[in-house]
Design a protein with these regions (language model features):
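N-terminal leader/linker segments that initiate helical-solenoid repeat arrays
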Residues: 2-25, 29-34, 39-187, 191-192, ...
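Canonical tetratricopeptide repeat
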Residues: 155, 196, 230, 263-264, ...
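Short coil turns that delineate tetratricopeptide repeat
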Residues: 147, 188, 222, 255-256, ...
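TPR alpha-solenoid repeat register
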Residues: 152, 193, 227, 260-261, ...
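Residue-level detector of the short coil/turn that links helix A to helix B
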Residues: 164, 171, 205, 239, ...
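Residue-level recognition of tetratricopeptide repeat
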Residues: 158, 162-165, 199, 233, ...
Length: 519
Protein backbone atom coordinates (compact mmCIF):
# COMPACT_ATOMS: atom_id res chain seq x y z
CA UNK A 1 0.00 0.00 0.00
CA UNK A 2 1.56 3.10 -0.21
CA UNK A 3 2.42 5.92 2.24
CA UNK A 4 1.53 8.00 2.13
CA UNK A 5 3.81 8.67 1.49
CA UNK A 6 3.51 7.90 -1.02
CA UNK A 7 2.09 8.46 1.02
CA UNK A 8 0.18 8.23 -0.72
CA UNK A 9 -1.21 7.63 -2.04
CA UNK A 10 -1.90 6.74 -3.65
CA UNK A 11 -5.00 7.16 -4.93
CA UNK A 12 -8.06 7.82 -2.66
CA UNK A 13 -8.82 6.97 0.91
CA UNK A 14 -11.92 5.05 1.99
CA UNK A 15 -15.11 6.55 3.29
CA UNK A 16 -15.96 5.80 6.88
CA UNK A 17 -18.01 2.66 7.46
CA UNK A 18 -21.43 3.73 8.71
CA UNK A 19 -22.68 0.29 9.71
CA UNK A 20 -21.71 -1.57 12.87
CA UNK A 21 -17.92 -1.69 13.05
CA UNK A 22 -16.26 -5.06 12.31
CA UNK A 23 -14.12 -6.99 14.75
CA UNK A 24 -10.62 -5.73 15.56
CA UNK A 25 -8.05 -7.55 13.45
CA UNK A 26 -5.89 -8.44 16.40
CA UNK A 27 -8.59 -10.69 17.85
CA UNK A 28 -10.92 -12.30 15.39
CA UNK A 29 -12.86 -13.95 18.21
CA UNK A 30 -13.68 -10.74 20.04
CA UNK A 31 -17.27 -9.44 20.02
CA UNK A 32 -18.11 -6.80 17.47
CA UNK A 33 -17.44 -3.31 18.83
CA UNK A 34 -20.20 -0.76 18.85
CA UNK A 35 -19.83 2.06 16.32
CA UNK A 36 -18.54 5.23 17.93
CA UNK A 37 -20.81 8.13 17.09
CA UNK A 38 -18.14 10.77 17.25
CA UNK A 39 -18.09 13.58 14.69
CA UNK A 40 -15.28 13.27 12.18
CA UNK A 41 -12.99 16.18 11.46
CA UNK A 42 -11.86 17.86 8.29
CA UNK A 43 -9.12 20.51 7.69
CA UNK A 44 -6.96 23.51 8.89
CA UNK A 45 -4.40 26.05 7.59
CA UNK A 46 -2.38 29.30 7.91
CA UNK A 47 -2.39 31.80 5.00
CA UNK A 48 -4.42 34.73 3.67
CA UNK A 49 -7.81 33.48 2.54
CA UNK A 50 -9.78 34.31 -0.57
CA UNK A 51 -13.28 35.57 0.28
CA UNK A 52 -14.69 33.88 -2.83
CA UNK A 53 -14.49 30.11 -2.33
CA UNK A 54 -14.42 29.52 -6.05
CA UNK A 55 -11.52 31.87 -6.71
CA UNK A 56 -8.64 30.16 -8.50
CA UNK A 57 -4.99 30.81 -7.71
CA UNK A 58 -3.08 32.44 -10.48
CA UNK A 59 -2.25 30.05 -13.31
CA UNK A 60 -4.26 27.26 -11.68
CA UNK A 61 -5.08 24.50 -14.20
CA UNK A 62 -8.52 23.19 -13.12
CA UNK A 63 -9.26 20.91 -16.06
CA UNK A 64 -7.44 17.66 -16.82
CA UNK A 65 -6.41 18.70 -20.33
CA UNK A 66 -5.24 22.10 -19.10
CA UNK A 67 -3.36 20.47 -16.24
CA UNK A 68 -1.54 18.11 -18.58
CA UNK A 69 -0.80 21.04 -20.89
CA UNK A 70 0.61 23.01 -17.97
CA UNK A 71 2.95 20.19 -17.05
CA UNK A 72 4.04 19.91 -20.66
CA UNK A 73 4.65 23.69 -20.86
CA UNK A 74 6.87 23.57 -17.80
CA UNK A 75 8.62 20.58 -19.33
CA UNK A 76 9.19 22.38 -22.62
CA UNK A 77 10.49 25.52 -20.92
CA UNK A 78 13.04 23.63 -18.84
CA UNK A 79 14.49 21.03 -21.20
CA UNK A 80 18.10 21.76 -20.33
CA UNK A 81 17.45 21.57 -16.58
CA UNK A 82 15.18 18.56 -16.68
CA UNK A 83 17.64 16.56 -18.79
CA UNK A 84 19.91 16.58 -15.75
CA UNK A 85 17.34 15.00 -13.43
CA UNK A 86 14.81 12.56 -15.01
CA UNK A 87 13.11 9.32 -14.13
CA UNK A 88 11.68 7.61 -11.10
CA UNK A 89 12.48 4.09 -9.92
CA UNK A 90 9.56 1.78 -10.65
CA UNK A 91 9.64 0.56 -7.06
CA UNK A 92 8.59 3.90 -5.60
CA UNK A 93 5.07 4.45 -4.39
CA UNK A 94 3.71 7.86 -4.42
CA UNK A 95 2.33 7.30 -0.88
CA UNK A 96 2.05 8.13 0.19
CA UNK A 97 0.41 8.92 0.61
CA UNK A 98 0.51 8.99 1.07
CA UNK A 99 1.56 7.95 0.52
CA UNK A 100 2.23 8.10 3.16
CA UNK A 101 4.26 5.92 1.13
CA UNK A 102 1.57 3.41 1.68
CA UNK A 103 -0.89 6.18 1.76
CA UNK A 104 -3.16 6.00 -1.21
CA UNK A 105 -4.30 9.14 0.55
CA UNK A 106 -5.33 9.68 4.14
CA UNK A 107 -8.02 12.03 2.98
CA UNK A 108 -11.34 10.28 2.59
CA UNK A 109 -11.22 8.53 5.96
CA UNK A 110 -14.46 8.96 7.75
CA UNK A 111 -15.96 11.23 5.14
CA UNK A 112 -19.22 9.33 5.50
CA UNK A 113 -19.81 10.91 8.91
CA UNK A 114 -20.85 14.52 9.18
CA UNK A 115 -18.92 16.94 11.34
CA UNK A 116 -20.75 19.08 13.84
CA UNK A 117 -22.15 21.71 11.55
CA UNK A 118 -23.79 25.07 11.54
CA UNK A 119 -27.36 25.21 10.20
CA UNK A 120 -27.38 24.55 6.49
CA UNK A 121 -23.81 23.26 6.40
CA UNK A 122 -22.71 20.96 3.62
CA UNK A 123 -21.86 17.53 5.02
CA UNK A 124 -18.51 15.89 4.26
CA UNK A 125 -20.67 13.01 2.99
CA UNK A 126 -20.79 15.04 -0.20
CA UNK A 127 -17.16 14.12 -0.85
CA UNK A 128 -18.11 10.44 -0.91
CA UNK A 129 -20.56 10.94 -3.75
CA UNK A 130 -18.02 9.87 -6.36
CA UNK A 131 -17.89 13.21 -8.21
CA UNK A 132 -15.34 15.37 -6.46
CA UNK A 133 -15.62 18.25 -8.92
CA UNK A 134 -19.39 18.40 -8.43
CA UNK A 135 -18.89 18.30 -4.67
CA UNK A 136 -16.49 21.24 -4.82
CA UNK A 137 -18.92 23.21 -6.98
CA UNK A 138 -21.72 22.56 -4.47
CA UNK A 139 -19.52 23.62 -1.56
CA UNK A 140 -18.49 26.80 -3.35
CA UNK A 141 -22.12 27.67 -4.06
CA UNK A 142 -23.10 27.02 -0.46
CA UNK A 143 -20.28 29.18 0.90
CA UNK A 144 -21.29 32.12 -1.27
CA UNK A 145 -24.57 32.23 0.65
CA UNK A 146 -23.22 30.99 4.01
CA UNK A 147 -19.68 32.43 4.19
CA UNK A 148 -19.46 31.93 7.98
CA UNK A 149 -19.99 28.17 7.85
CA UNK A 150 -16.64 27.09 9.26
CA UNK A 151 -17.31 23.39 8.77
CA UNK A 152 -18.02 23.79 5.08
CA UNK A 153 -14.82 25.82 4.67
CA UNK A 154 -12.96 22.92 6.28
CA UNK A 155 -14.74 20.43 4.03
CA UNK A 156 -13.82 22.51 0.98
CA UNK A 157 -10.20 22.51 2.10
CA UNK A 158 -10.29 18.76 2.41
CA UNK A 159 -11.84 18.49 -1.04
CA UNK A 160 -9.04 20.56 -2.54
CA UNK A 161 -6.42 18.33 -0.88
CA UNK A 162 -8.17 15.27 -2.28
CA UNK A 163 -8.38 16.84 -5.73
CA UNK A 164 -4.69 17.74 -5.69
CA UNK A 165 -3.78 14.21 -4.70
CA UNK A 166 -6.03 12.27 -7.04
CA UNK A 167 -5.48 14.47 -10.10
CA UNK A 168 -1.80 15.18 -9.71
CA UNK A 169 -2.59 18.88 -9.34
CA UNK A 170 -0.41 20.44 -6.61
CA UNK A 171 -1.71 23.93 -7.39
CA UNK A 172 -4.79 23.03 -5.33
CA UNK A 173 -2.77 22.93 -2.11
CA UNK A 174 -2.64 26.73 -1.63
CA UNK A 175 -6.41 26.82 -2.13
CA UNK A 176 -6.81 24.08 0.45
CA UNK A 177 -4.71 26.06 2.89
CA UNK A 178 -6.77 29.20 2.28
CA UNK A 179 -10.03 27.36 2.89
CA UNK A 180 -8.71 25.80 6.08
CA UNK A 181 -7.40 29.15 7.29
CA UNK A 182 -10.83 30.60 6.69
CA UNK A 183 -12.39 27.86 8.80
CA UNK A 184 -9.96 28.52 11.64
CA UNK A 185 -10.50 32.25 11.47
CA UNK A 186 -14.23 31.68 11.88
CA UNK A 187 -13.85 29.09 14.64
CA UNK A 188 -10.31 28.97 16.10
CA UNK A 189 -9.11 25.50 16.97
CA UNK A 190 -12.06 23.69 15.42
CA UNK A 191 -11.47 19.97 15.03
CA UNK A 192 -12.44 19.80 11.37
CA UNK A 193 -9.83 22.31 10.30
CA UNK A 194 -7.10 20.92 12.55
CA UNK A 195 -7.61 17.45 11.13
CA UNK A 196 -7.55 18.91 7.65
CA UNK A 197 -4.28 20.63 8.44
CA UNK A 198 -2.86 17.20 9.27
CA UNK A 199 -4.06 15.90 5.90
CA UNK A 200 -2.61 18.89 4.05
CA UNK A 201 0.74 18.57 5.83
CA UNK A 202 0.91 14.88 4.93
CA UNK A 203 0.02 15.62 1.31
CA UNK A 204 2.94 18.06 1.19
CA UNK A 205 5.17 15.42 2.82
CA UNK A 206 5.50 17.44 6.02
CA UNK A 207 4.99 14.40 8.22
CA UNK A 208 6.24 16.06 11.40
CA UNK A 209 3.59 18.72 10.93
CA UNK A 210 0.96 16.08 10.18
CA UNK A 211 1.78 14.30 13.43
CA UNK A 212 1.61 17.55 15.40
CA UNK A 213 -1.86 18.39 14.10
CA UNK A 214 -3.17 14.86 14.55
CA UNK A 215 -2.00 14.90 18.17
CA UNK A 216 -3.75 18.25 18.73
CA UNK A 217 -7.03 16.79 17.52
CA UNK A 218 -6.67 13.61 19.56
CA UNK A 219 -6.02 15.62 22.71
CA UNK A 220 -9.52 17.05 22.38
CA UNK A 221 -11.22 14.07 20.70
CA UNK A 222 -9.44 10.74 21.29
CA UNK A 223 -11.96 9.00 19.01
CA UNK A 224 -11.43 11.04 15.86
CA UNK A 225 -11.04 8.37 13.18
CA UNK A 226 -9.39 10.71 10.73
CA UNK A 227 -6.85 11.93 13.29
CA UNK A 228 -6.13 8.39 14.51
CA UNK A 229 -5.48 7.37 10.91
CA UNK A 230 -3.37 10.43 10.15
CA UNK A 231 -1.26 9.74 13.22
CA UNK A 232 -0.45 6.21 12.03
CA UNK A 233 0.42 7.53 8.57
CA UNK A 234 2.73 10.20 9.95
CA UNK A 235 4.57 7.80 12.25
CA UNK A 236 5.06 5.33 9.39
CA UNK A 237 6.39 8.05 7.11
CA UNK A 238 8.77 9.24 9.82
CA UNK A 239 10.15 5.72 10.18
CA UNK A 240 8.87 5.36 13.74
CA UNK A 241 7.55 1.87 13.12
CA UNK A 242 7.29 0.72 16.74
CA UNK A 243 5.28 3.83 17.57
CA UNK A 244 3.17 3.32 14.45
CA UNK A 245 2.37 -0.22 15.57
CA UNK A 246 1.23 1.04 18.97
CA UNK A 247 -0.80 3.77 17.29
CA UNK A 248 -2.46 1.20 15.03
CA UNK A 249 -3.38 -0.96 18.03
CA UNK A 250 -4.81 2.07 19.81
CA UNK A 251 -6.78 3.18 16.75
CA UNK A 252 -8.13 -0.34 16.29
CA UNK A 253 -9.36 -0.40 19.88
CA UNK A 254 -11.04 2.99 19.56
CA UNK A 255 -12.36 3.15 16.00
CA UNK A 256 -12.19 -0.23 14.22
CA UNK A 257 -13.18 0.13 10.58
CA UNK A 258 -11.81 0.23 7.07
CA UNK A 259 -9.51 3.28 7.46
CA UNK A 260 -7.85 1.85 10.56
CA UNK A 261 -7.77 -1.73 9.28
CA UNK A 262 -5.85 -0.77 6.14
CA UNK A 263 -3.21 1.02 8.17
CA UNK A 264 -3.05 -1.79 10.70
CA UNK A 265 -2.37 -4.15 7.80
CA UNK A 266 0.38 -1.97 6.35
CA UNK A 267 2.21 -1.73 9.66
CA UNK A 268 2.28 -5.54 9.73
CA UNK A 269 3.40 -5.70 6.09
CA UNK A 270 6.34 -3.42 6.89
CA UNK A 271 7.42 -5.93 9.53
CA UNK A 272 7.20 -8.79 7.03
CA UNK A 273 3.97 -10.19 8.48
CA UNK A 274 2.22 -10.58 5.14
CA UNK A 275 -0.18 -13.22 6.45
CA UNK A 276 -1.66 -10.88 9.04
CA UNK A 277 -1.75 -8.00 6.58
CA UNK A 278 -3.69 -10.10 4.09
CA UNK A 279 -6.11 -11.39 6.73
CA UNK A 280 -6.88 -7.91 7.99
CA UNK A 281 -7.40 -6.55 4.48
CA UNK A 282 -9.68 -9.45 3.56
CA UNK A 283 -11.66 -8.71 6.71
CA UNK A 284 -11.85 -5.05 5.75
CA UNK A 285 -13.00 -5.91 2.22
CA UNK A 286 -15.67 -8.18 3.64
CA UNK A 287 -17.08 -5.34 5.72
CA UNK A 288 -16.77 -2.63 3.07
CA UNK A 289 -20.09 -1.25 1.86
CA UNK A 290 -19.33 1.92 -0.09
CA UNK A 291 -17.78 1.95 -3.55
CA UNK A 292 -14.89 3.99 -2.19
CA UNK A 293 -14.14 1.46 0.52
CA UNK A 294 -14.34 -1.49 -1.87
CA UNK A 295 -12.05 0.05 -4.48
CA UNK A 296 -9.55 1.21 -1.85
CA UNK A 297 -9.27 -2.07 0.04
CA UNK A 298 -9.35 -4.28 -3.06
CA UNK A 299 -6.51 -2.22 -4.52
CA UNK A 300 -4.52 -2.58 -1.30
CA UNK A 301 -4.97 -6.35 -1.56
CA UNK A 302 -3.89 -6.21 -5.20
CA UNK A 303 -0.74 -4.34 -4.28
CA UNK A 304 0.02 -6.80 -1.50
CA UNK A 305 -0.41 -9.74 -3.90
CA UNK A 306 1.77 -8.06 -6.55
CA UNK A 307 4.52 -7.46 -3.99
CA UNK A 308 4.57 -11.22 -3.37
CA UNK A 309 4.65 -12.04 -7.10
CA UNK A 310 1.07 -13.38 -7.13
CA UNK A 311 -0.04 -11.62 -10.30
CA UNK A 312 -3.21 -13.65 -10.85
CA UNK A 313 -4.53 -12.69 -7.42
CA UNK A 314 -3.43 -9.10 -7.95
CA UNK A 315 -5.42 -8.88 -11.18
CA UNK A 316 -8.44 -10.40 -9.45
CA UNK A 317 -8.36 -7.74 -6.75
CA UNK A 318 -7.80 -4.93 -9.22
CA UNK A 319 -10.81 -6.16 -11.19
CA UNK A 320 -12.84 -6.05 -7.97
CA UNK A 321 -11.68 -2.49 -7.33
CA UNK A 322 -12.51 -1.35 -10.85
CA UNK A 323 -15.92 -3.00 -10.71
CA UNK A 324 -16.65 -0.66 -7.81
CA UNK A 325 -15.04 2.38 -9.45
CA UNK A 326 -13.80 2.04 -13.02
CA UNK A 327 -11.83 5.29 -12.78
CA UNK A 328 -9.90 4.48 -9.61
CA UNK A 329 -6.32 5.48 -10.43
CA UNK A 330 -4.34 3.14 -8.14
CA UNK A 331 -6.28 0.14 -9.44
CA UNK A 332 -5.68 1.15 -13.06
CA UNK A 333 -1.97 1.56 -12.34
CA UNK A 334 -1.80 -1.69 -10.44
CA UNK A 335 -3.55 -3.63 -13.19
CA UNK A 336 -1.09 -2.35 -15.79
CA UNK A 337 1.82 -3.22 -13.50
CA UNK A 338 0.54 -6.77 -13.00
CA UNK A 339 -0.07 -7.18 -16.73
CA UNK A 340 3.52 -6.16 -17.41
CA UNK A 341 4.80 -8.63 -14.83
CA UNK A 342 2.79 -11.41 -16.50
CA UNK A 343 4.34 -10.53 -19.86
CA UNK A 344 1.31 -8.83 -21.39
CA UNK A 345 3.37 -5.87 -22.53
CA UNK A 346 0.81 -4.48 -24.98
CA UNK A 347 -1.98 -4.35 -22.40
CA UNK A 348 0.36 -2.91 -19.79
CA UNK A 349 1.52 -0.09 -22.06
CA UNK A 350 -2.02 0.69 -23.20
CA UNK A 351 -3.24 0.77 -19.61
CA UNK A 352 -0.41 2.94 -18.34
CA UNK A 353 -0.82 5.31 -21.29
CA UNK A 354 -4.45 5.78 -20.27
CA UNK A 355 -3.41 6.51 -16.70
CA UNK A 356 -0.77 9.03 -17.76
CA UNK A 357 -3.15 10.74 -20.17
CA UNK A 358 -5.53 11.39 -17.31
CA UNK A 359 -3.10 12.01 -14.46
CA UNK A 360 0.58 12.73 -15.27
CA UNK A 361 1.93 11.66 -11.89
CA UNK A 362 5.54 10.55 -11.32
CA UNK A 363 5.12 6.83 -10.82
CA UNK A 364 2.98 6.03 -13.88
CA UNK A 365 5.12 8.35 -16.00
CA UNK A 366 8.27 6.49 -15.07
CA UNK A 367 6.73 3.06 -15.30
CA UNK A 368 5.44 3.89 -18.77
CA UNK A 369 8.90 5.12 -19.74
CA UNK A 370 10.47 1.89 -18.53
CA UNK A 371 7.86 -0.15 -20.38
CA UNK A 372 8.79 1.69 -23.58
CA UNK A 373 12.48 1.02 -22.92
CA UNK A 374 11.84 -2.65 -22.28
CA UNK A 375 9.79 -2.98 -25.48
CA UNK A 376 12.47 -1.30 -27.59
CA UNK A 377 10.44 -0.52 -30.70
CA UNK A 378 11.42 2.26 -33.07
CA UNK A 379 10.79 5.57 -31.34
CA UNK A 380 10.41 4.00 -27.90
CA UNK A 381 13.63 5.53 -26.59
CA UNK A 382 12.29 9.01 -27.31
CA UNK A 383 8.92 8.12 -25.84
CA UNK A 384 10.63 6.98 -22.67
CA UNK A 385 12.67 10.17 -22.51
CA UNK A 386 9.49 12.21 -22.83
CA UNK A 387 7.94 10.46 -19.84
CA UNK A 388 11.01 11.02 -17.68
CA UNK A 389 11.06 14.68 -18.69
CA UNK A 390 7.46 15.08 -17.58
CA UNK A 391 8.37 13.61 -14.19
CA UNK A 392 10.95 16.33 -13.73
CA UNK A 393 8.43 18.96 -14.80
CA UNK A 394 5.90 17.62 -12.29
CA UNK A 395 8.50 17.69 -9.50
CA UNK A 396 9.24 21.31 -10.38
CA UNK A 397 5.55 22.20 -10.18
CA UNK A 398 5.18 20.32 -6.90
CA UNK A 399 8.07 22.25 -5.35
CA UNK A 400 6.51 25.53 -6.46
CA UNK A 401 3.33 24.67 -4.54
CA UNK A 402 5.06 23.68 -1.33
CA UNK A 403 5.33 19.91 -1.84
CA UNK A 404 8.55 18.22 -0.77
CA UNK A 405 9.43 15.96 -3.70
CA UNK A 406 13.02 15.05 -2.78
CA UNK A 407 12.28 11.32 -2.60
CA UNK A 408 10.79 11.41 -6.10
CA UNK A 409 13.77 13.41 -7.34
CA UNK A 410 16.29 11.03 -5.75
CA UNK A 411 14.76 7.93 -7.28
CA UNK A 412 14.16 9.64 -10.60
CA UNK A 413 17.61 11.07 -11.09
CA UNK A 414 19.39 7.94 -9.86
CA UNK A 415 17.88 5.75 -12.57
CA UNK A 416 17.33 8.20 -15.42
CA UNK A 417 19.07 11.51 -14.83
CA UNK A 418 21.79 13.43 -13.02
CA UNK A 419 23.35 11.21 -10.38
CA UNK A 420 24.70 14.11 -8.38
CA UNK A 421 21.21 15.56 -8.10
CA UNK A 422 19.96 12.15 -7.01
CA UNK A 423 22.43 12.01 -4.13
CA UNK A 424 21.73 15.57 -3.05
CA UNK A 425 17.99 14.91 -2.93
CA UNK A 426 18.40 11.56 -1.16
CA UNK A 427 20.58 13.11 1.53
CA UNK A 428 18.05 15.89 2.05
CA UNK A 429 15.22 13.40 2.44
CA UNK A 430 17.25 11.20 4.79
CA UNK A 431 17.95 14.25 6.96
CA UNK A 432 14.21 14.71 7.38
CA UNK A 433 13.13 11.13 8.04
CA UNK A 434 14.62 7.67 8.39
CA UNK A 435 12.34 5.11 6.73
CA UNK A 436 12.94 1.95 4.74
CA UNK A 437 12.10 3.93 1.61
CA UNK A 438 14.50 6.79 2.31
CA UNK A 439 17.22 4.30 3.30
CA UNK A 440 16.75 2.49 0.00
CA UNK A 441 16.77 5.75 -1.98
CA UNK A 442 19.97 6.95 -0.30
CA UNK A 443 21.65 3.57 -0.78
CA UNK A 444 20.82 3.54 -4.49
CA UNK A 445 21.88 7.15 -5.00
CA UNK A 446 25.23 6.41 -3.35
CA UNK A 447 25.59 3.29 -5.52
CA UNK A 448 25.05 5.07 -8.82
CA UNK A 449 27.63 7.63 -7.70
CA UNK A 450 30.18 4.86 -7.13
CA UNK A 451 30.08 5.11 -3.34
CA UNK A 452 29.10 1.52 -2.64
CA UNK A 453 30.93 1.13 0.66
CA UNK A 454 28.84 4.00 2.05
CA UNK A 455 25.73 2.62 0.39
CA UNK A 456 25.80 -0.87 1.87
CA UNK A 457 24.69 -0.02 5.45
CA UNK A 458 21.70 1.90 4.09
CA UNK A 459 20.76 -0.93 1.73
CA UNK A 460 20.81 -3.34 4.65
CA UNK A 461 18.80 -0.94 6.79
CA UNK A 462 16.14 -0.76 4.06
CA UNK A 463 15.59 -4.52 4.29
CA UNK A 464 16.07 -4.86 8.06
CA UNK A 465 12.39 -4.72 9.07
CA UNK A 466 11.50 -7.79 7.00
CA UNK A 467 9.43 -5.79 4.52
CA UNK A 468 9.01 -7.88 1.36
CA UNK A 469 10.09 -5.52 -1.41
CA UNK A 470 11.85 -6.93 -4.47
CA UNK A 471 13.29 -3.57 -5.51
CA UNK A 472 14.97 -3.15 -2.14
CA UNK A 473 16.47 -6.63 -2.43
CA UNK A 474 17.63 -5.89 -5.97
CA UNK A 475 19.31 -2.66 -4.89
CA UNK A 476 20.95 -4.43 -1.96
CA UNK A 477 22.17 -7.24 -4.20
CA UNK A 478 23.72 -4.89 -6.73
CA UNK A 479 25.46 -2.95 -3.97
CA UNK A 480 26.72 -6.15 -2.34
CA UNK A 481 28.04 -7.24 -5.73
CA UNK A 482 29.86 -3.94 -6.19
CA UNK A 483 31.50 -4.26 -2.77
CA UNK A 484 32.73 -7.79 -3.42
CA UNK A 485 30.18 -9.64 -1.30
CA UNK A 486 29.42 -12.12 -4.09
CA UNK A 487 27.68 -14.77 -2.02
CA UNK A 488 25.39 -12.24 -0.33
CA UNK A 489 24.77 -10.53 -3.68
CA UNK A 490 23.59 -13.75 -5.31
CA UNK A 491 21.31 -14.46 -2.36
CA UNK A 492 19.77 -10.97 -2.45
CA UNK A 493 19.26 -10.94 -6.23
CA UNK A 494 17.76 -14.42 -6.18
CA UNK A 495 15.45 -13.40 -3.33
CA UNK A 496 14.29 -10.38 -5.32
CA UNK A 497 13.39 -12.49 -8.35
CA UNK A 498 11.91 -15.30 -6.28
CA UNK A 499 9.70 -12.81 -4.48
CA UNK A 500 8.53 -10.80 -7.49
CA UNK A 501 10.12 -11.69 -10.82
CA UNK A 502 8.38 -8.78 -12.55
CA UNK A 503 9.10 -6.09 -9.97
CA UNK A 504 10.40 -3.70 -12.64
CA UNK A 505 10.63 -3.88 -16.44
CA UNK A 506 14.28 -2.82 -16.33
CA UNK A 507 15.38 -3.75 -12.81
CA UNK A 508 14.28 -7.37 -13.10
CA UNK A 509 16.20 -7.69 -16.36
CA UNK A 510 19.34 -6.29 -14.73
CA UNK A 511 18.94 -8.63 -11.76
CA UNK A 512 18.75 -11.67 -14.04
CA UNK A 513 21.77 -10.46 -15.97
CA UNK A 514 23.80 -9.95 -12.79
CA UNK A 515 22.87 -13.42 -11.52
CA UNK A 516 23.93 -14.96 -14.81
CA UNK A 517 27.28 -13.22 -14.69
CA UNK A 518 27.80 -14.35 -11.10
CA UNK A 519 27.50 -18.04 -11.98
Amino acid sequence: MSPRTNESAPEGEPDEVTTAAPQPPHDASAPEPEPVAKPVAEDKAELPVAEDPSSEPEDHPPVADERVAAVRRVSASSRRWRAAQLGLCAASLAVALTAGAMIFGALRDGSGTAVAATPGAVSPQLLASGDLDASITALQAHLRTQPKDFDSWATLGLAYVEQARTKGDPSRYPQAQQALDRSLKLRPGNESALTGRAALAAARHDFTGALTYADKVLKENPYSERALSSRIDALVELGRYADASKAADLADSRRPGVPVFTRYAYVHELRGDVKTARRVLEQALGTATSRGDVSYVATALGQLAWNQGDYASALKYYARALAADDSYLPALEGRARAQAAQGDQAAAIKGMEQVVERYPLPQPLVELGELYEARGHAGDAQKAHDQYSLVTAWVSLAHSYGVNADLDTALAAADHGNRGDALKAARAEWARRHTVHTADALAWALHVNGRDKEALPYARQATATGYHNASFLYHRGMIERATGHEKEARASLKSALDLNAGFSPLGAREARKALGEAK
